[in-house]
Protein backbone atom coordinates (compact mmCIF):
# COMPACT_ATOMS: atom_id res chain seq x y z
CA UNK A 1 0.00 0.00 0.00
CA UNK A 2 1.09 3.56 -0.61
CA UNK A 3 -0.19 7.06 -0.18
CA UNK A 4 -0.29 7.85 -3.89
CA UNK A 5 -2.09 11.12 -4.47
CA UNK A 6 0.37 13.97 -4.98
CA UNK A 7 -1.73 16.72 -3.39
CA UNK A 8 -2.70 14.55 -0.40
CA UNK A 9 0.99 13.82 0.19
CA UNK A 10 1.81 17.54 0.14
CA UNK A 11 -0.84 18.30 2.77
CA UNK A 12 0.03 15.26 4.93
CA UNK A 13 3.82 14.92 4.73
CA UNK A 14 4.32 12.83 7.86
CA UNK A 15 1.61 10.37 6.83
CA UNK A 16 3.18 10.12 3.38
CA UNK A 17 6.62 9.39 4.85
CA UNK A 18 5.20 6.90 7.35
CA UNK A 19 3.13 5.08 4.74
CA UNK A 20 5.50 5.04 1.77
CA UNK A 21 8.91 4.78 3.45
CA UNK A 22 7.87 3.00 6.65
CA UNK A 23 5.74 0.63 4.60
CA UNK A 24 8.72 -0.26 2.42
CA UNK A 25 10.80 -1.04 5.51
CA UNK A 26 8.00 -3.23 6.87
CA UNK A 27 7.75 -5.21 3.62
CA UNK A 28 11.53 -5.75 3.52
CA UNK A 29 11.61 -6.92 7.15
CA UNK A 30 8.66 -9.26 6.59
CA UNK A 31 10.31 -10.75 3.50
CA UNK A 32 13.54 -11.33 5.41
CA UNK A 33 11.71 -13.04 8.27
CA UNK A 34 9.82 -15.45 6.02
CA UNK A 35 10.59 -17.82 3.16
CA UNK A 36 9.84 -15.30 0.42
CA UNK A 37 12.27 -15.53 -2.50
CA UNK A 38 11.33 -12.54 -4.65
CA UNK A 39 9.87 -9.12 -3.89
CA UNK A 40 8.91 -6.56 -6.50
CA UNK A 41 7.96 -3.15 -5.16
CA UNK A 42 5.42 -1.23 -7.21
CA UNK A 43 6.59 2.30 -7.73
CA UNK A 44 5.82 5.27 -9.94
CA UNK A 45 7.25 7.32 -12.76
CA UNK A 46 7.22 10.20 -10.25
CA UNK A 47 10.15 8.56 -8.41
CA UNK A 48 12.44 9.48 -11.31
CA UNK A 49 13.79 13.00 -10.65
CA UNK A 50 11.05 13.74 -8.09
CA UNK A 51 9.58 17.23 -7.86
CA UNK A 52 7.19 16.54 -5.00
CA UNK A 53 7.03 14.71 -1.68
CA UNK A 54 5.18 11.73 -3.14
CA UNK A 55 7.90 11.16 -5.74
CA UNK A 56 10.63 11.66 -3.13
CA UNK A 57 9.11 9.08 -0.78
CA UNK A 58 8.70 6.58 -3.62
CA UNK A 59 12.32 7.17 -4.68
CA UNK A 60 13.38 6.51 -1.09
CA UNK A 61 11.18 3.41 -1.00
CA UNK A 62 12.78 2.19 -4.25
CA UNK A 63 16.25 2.70 -2.76
CA UNK A 64 15.25 0.75 0.36
CA UNK A 65 14.15 -2.21 -1.77
CA UNK A 66 17.18 -2.14 -4.08
CA UNK A 67 19.70 -1.74 -1.24
CA UNK A 68 18.08 -4.63 0.65
CA UNK A 69 19.77 -6.95 -1.85
CA UNK A 70 23.05 -5.94 -0.16
CA UNK A 71 21.70 -6.62 3.32
CA UNK A 72 20.62 -10.13 2.38
CA UNK A 73 23.91 -10.74 0.58
CA UNK A 74 24.64 -14.41 -0.04
CA UNK A 75 22.78 -15.54 3.09
CA UNK A 76 19.76 -16.69 1.12
CA UNK A 77 18.10 -16.46 -2.26
CA UNK A 78 15.85 -13.48 -1.42
CA UNK A 79 15.91 -10.81 -4.13
CA UNK A 80 14.34 -7.35 -4.38
CA UNK A 81 13.49 -5.33 -7.50
CA UNK A 82 11.21 -2.43 -8.40
CA UNK A 83 8.64 -1.80 -11.14
CA UNK A 84 7.95 1.84 -11.99
CA UNK A 85 4.97 2.72 -14.13
CA UNK A 86 2.55 5.59 -14.55
CA UNK A 87 -1.13 5.90 -13.82
CA UNK A 88 -3.30 2.81 -13.99
CA UNK A 89 -6.35 3.69 -16.08
CA UNK A 90 -9.41 3.97 -13.85
CA UNK A 91 -7.57 3.57 -10.54
CA UNK A 92 -8.86 5.32 -7.45
CA UNK A 93 -7.97 9.00 -7.39
CA UNK A 94 -6.88 9.18 -11.02
CA UNK A 95 -8.38 11.61 -13.50
CA UNK A 96 -10.41 9.08 -15.53
CA UNK A 97 -12.93 8.23 -12.76
CA UNK A 98 -13.01 11.91 -11.73
CA UNK A 99 -13.90 13.00 -15.27
CA UNK A 100 -16.39 10.13 -15.61
CA UNK A 101 -18.14 11.16 -12.40
CA UNK A 102 -18.38 14.79 -13.53
CA UNK A 103 -19.72 13.71 -16.93
CA UNK A 104 -22.29 11.41 -15.29
CA UNK A 105 -23.38 14.29 -13.02
CA UNK A 106 -24.13 16.36 -16.13
CA UNK A 107 -21.46 18.98 -15.47
CA UNK A 108 -20.93 21.50 -18.24
CA UNK A 109 -17.14 21.66 -17.97
CA UNK A 110 -14.17 19.55 -16.93
CA UNK A 111 -11.38 20.96 -14.76
CA UNK A 112 -7.94 20.98 -16.39
CA UNK A 113 -4.89 21.77 -14.26
CA UNK A 114 -2.72 22.97 -17.14
CA UNK A 115 -2.96 22.43 -20.90
CA UNK A 116 0.63 21.12 -20.93
CA UNK A 117 0.03 18.56 -18.13
CA UNK A 118 0.57 14.96 -19.24
CA UNK A 119 0.32 11.54 -17.61
CA UNK A 120 1.72 8.14 -18.51
CA UNK A 121 -1.04 5.52 -18.75
CA UNK A 122 -1.15 1.75 -18.40
CA UNK A 123 -4.16 -0.56 -18.11
CA UNK A 124 -4.57 -2.81 -15.11
CA UNK A 125 -4.08 -5.87 -17.34
CA UNK A 126 -0.88 -4.43 -18.84
CA UNK A 127 0.48 -3.56 -15.40
CA UNK A 128 -0.17 -7.06 -14.03
CA UNK A 129 1.42 -8.68 -17.10
CA UNK A 130 4.46 -6.41 -16.81
CA UNK A 131 4.93 -7.23 -13.12
CA UNK A 132 4.65 -10.97 -13.81
CA UNK A 133 7.23 -10.72 -16.63
CA UNK A 134 9.48 -8.73 -14.32
CA UNK A 135 9.30 -11.53 -11.74
CA UNK A 136 10.51 -13.95 -14.42
CA UNK A 137 13.39 -11.69 -15.50
CA UNK A 138 14.55 -10.34 -12.14
CA UNK A 139 17.91 -11.16 -10.67
CA UNK A 140 17.67 -8.59 -7.87
CA UNK A 141 18.37 -4.87 -7.92
CA UNK A 142 16.62 -3.98 -11.18
CA UNK A 143 14.23 -1.11 -11.72
CA UNK A 144 11.87 -2.24 -14.48
CA UNK A 145 10.13 0.51 -16.48
CA UNK A 146 7.58 -0.33 -19.19
CA UNK A 147 7.33 1.73 -22.36
CA UNK A 148 3.89 3.26 -22.06
CA UNK A 149 2.19 6.18 -23.79
CA UNK A 150 1.60 9.59 -22.32
CA UNK A 151 -1.39 11.77 -23.00
CA UNK A 152 -2.14 15.39 -22.24
CA UNK A 153 -4.94 15.71 -19.69
CA UNK A 154 -6.73 18.17 -21.97
CA UNK A 155 -6.68 15.59 -24.80
CA UNK A 156 -8.07 12.96 -22.43
CA UNK A 157 -10.88 15.35 -21.48
CA UNK A 158 -11.64 15.99 -25.16
CA UNK A 159 -11.73 12.24 -25.87
CA UNK A 160 -14.02 11.49 -22.91
CA UNK A 161 -16.39 14.43 -23.42
CA UNK A 162 -15.82 16.17 -26.76
CA UNK A 163 -18.75 18.56 -26.28
CA UNK A 164 -17.85 19.78 -22.80
CA UNK A 165 -15.90 22.94 -22.09
CA UNK A 166 -12.71 22.95 -20.06
CA UNK A 167 -11.87 25.16 -17.12
CA UNK A 168 -8.19 25.76 -16.36
CA UNK A 169 -7.92 25.44 -12.57
CA UNK A 170 -4.15 25.53 -12.14
CA UNK A 171 -1.74 22.97 -10.83
CA UNK A 172 -2.31 21.40 -7.44
CA UNK A 173 0.36 21.46 -4.75
CA UNK A 174 3.26 19.21 -5.75
CA UNK A 175 2.48 19.11 -9.48
What role is predicted for each listed range?
Residues 53-54, 59-138, 149-153, 157-163:
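NAD(P)-dependent short-chain dehydrogenase/reductase
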Residues 1, 39-44, 83-85:
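SDR active-site strand-loop-helix element
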Residues 1-18:
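NAD(P)H-binding glycine-rich loop region in Rossmannoid oxidoreductase-like domains
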Residues 164-175:
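Terminal hydrophobic/aromatic helix or amphipathic segment near a protein terminus
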Residues 33, 45-50, 88-90:
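Conserved catalytic-site region of short-chain dehydrogenase/reductase
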Residues 34-38, 76-78:
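A short helix->loop->beta-strand "cap" motif at the edges of active sites that frequently abuts
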